[in-house]
């Protein structure tokens, strides 16, 4: 029988549409800067649409994943292994950034006097209360009310409530089936909405890129270009050497994985926010063969604790400012910087500008590097945010697959099949593919039913 070709025409693929949108945005922003800046609402509107759906998707995914598990001990094991992975790999990212910036030294010879820098532009990032302390950060994980957590879209707060709800629903056994089925069906509705939102992703990427080029100009890319080139190169080394090695040790190719999430990467490239594809990334990973409970726990947590691109940026930017302002940093001072960053880097979120806020807080905490030096990189920070967001996204995707492999929640055969023989429908509409699968409550435990 003749094989039917289900491939879409190129012009209908999200991959092609986003590429065209990004190029169009660059052209408009470069030749018509005022018009480019006016496109900002398109990018902002797209990200707001995504943020609108993130909290309920995380809630549904985590609840269904946990309530559907046979062994509750696996939830704690999954969370513990995820945090261990995050700490080790983000530490490697910090060390890699520190190593390369000391080898290349892009700031050496600039001889900038910090007192001559215009610090008005960085005032918004260095004001009081911009960066939480450790205790404040932990307390902020607990919402004032459940409604408040959803209303503000606080990912970790929603995650905490979802985990507790999932445990409680699991304890009900068969009596909780009605609630479980409702939440499971509701999650499919939400992912269908995500599919609708992604139809306008090219418009969002176009607007965000046109605004960036129109406001900051291509010329700002040429200034401080050595730092940008060094940072982008370091991110590539981290992705293909560090993450590539981790992927290979766990049975998959980083090249094939990147190809699998290419649409998400292009959207992130256009919007500079890895959060813009969080719901779609969850659908993609579940479609890849990762159990729903692992996806629901690892991905949202990773957006606060596993920001590899941001970690690289923080060490490189801090040492670059020291080099440019002729501020000597000996080994002890650099190790102190590293220790502070191990804490402050966990306070960044997957949104545009968070890395700059964390950097400002870190320089203030260390005290050795002049905070005024932030003005040096303010103009190009927006352009480096693309590499940060892309690296963060790939890092969280790899982390989810690895943790799933460790806990036995990864369908290896399905993953290999998806990475090798992905169809256009799976690439463009993972939300639709999920509708072909179903999750069920575990078998009723009579003892649990009697206790309830």
From Swiss-Prot:
It is a multi-pass membrane protein. GO terms for cellular component: plasma membrane. It comes from the Bacteria. Residues 417-452 are annotated as: Disordered. GO terms for molecular function: fumarate transmembrane transporter activity; malate:proton symporter activity; succinate transmembrane transporter activity. Its main location: membrane. Keywords: Cell inner membrane, Cell membrane, Membrane, Plasmid, Symport, Transmembrane, Transmembrane helix, Transport. The chain crosses the membrane at residues 14-34, 49-69, 81-101, 149-169, 189-209, 227-247, 294-314, 336-356, 357-377. SUPFAM superfamilies: Proton glutamate symport protein. InterPro entries: C4_dicarb_transport, Na-dicarboxylate_symporter, Na-dicarboxylate_symporter_CS, Na:dicarbo_symporter_sf. The keyword Transcription does not apply. It holds the Pfam family SDF. GO terms for biological process: L-aspartate transmembrane transport. It is found in: Cell inner membrane. Belongs to the dicarboxylate/amino acid:cation symporter (DAACS) (TC 2.A.23) family. Responsible for the transport of dicarboxylates such as succinate, fumarate, and malate from the periplasm across the membrane. PANTHER family: AEROBIC C4-DICARBOXYLATE TRANSPORT PROTEIN (PTHR42865:SF1), PROTON/GLUTAMATE-ASPARTATE SYMPORTER (PTHR42865). This is C4-dicarboxylate transport protein 2. It comes from Cupriavidus metallidurans (strain ATCC 43123 / DSM 2839 / NBRC 102507 / CH34).
